[in-house]
Amino acid sequence: MDKRKELDLQKKATQIRKYIIEEVFSAKSGHPGGSLSCTDILTVLYFDEMNVDPKNPKWPDRDRFVLSKGHCAPALYATLAVKGFFPEKDLYTFRKADSYLEGHPSMRYVPVSYTHLRAHETP
């Protein structure tokens, strides 16, 4: 990876971390540690590796991301907002009444396809 790309990813990761802290602080609820710990991974995946299109989130040939760590919703939401899937201002509605940014991600509301299963659930 060239230095310019690496610097760009570092800047995006820094912005995502800032949003994670702001989401959790604004909601007065959440798990910042888990979200902060996966920021670099999400940044590289969404901004350098995965084939996704914020303008066409249901694109049949898109790559899929499986989130098995539901408490990292703030990191996923911040990454998706920075990528352009929804307005960054929506991050400040995290865990608020009537917000689509719930404490655990839900395919019903966030404009991408992913799944969060508990141990007792089946796909």
Describe each model-derived feature in a short phrase.
Residues 116-123:
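Single conserved hydrophobic/aromatic residue that forms the stacking wall/gate
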Residues 85-93:
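A glycine-rich helix N-cap at a beta->alpha junction
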Residues 2:
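Conserved, charged catalytic cores of large soluble enzymes
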Residues 77-86:
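Alpha-helical support elements that line or immediately flank enzyme active sites
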Residues 94-113:
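An acidic/histidine-cluster motif and surrounding catalytic segment
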Residues 44-48, 82-83, 122:
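Active-site catalytic microenvironments for nucleophilic, acid-base chemistry
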Residues 6-71:
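N-terminal amphipathic, basic-rich helices that act as targeting or association modules
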Residues 71-73, 83, 100-101:
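A short acidic, glycine/proline-enriched capping/turn motif at secondary-structure boundaries
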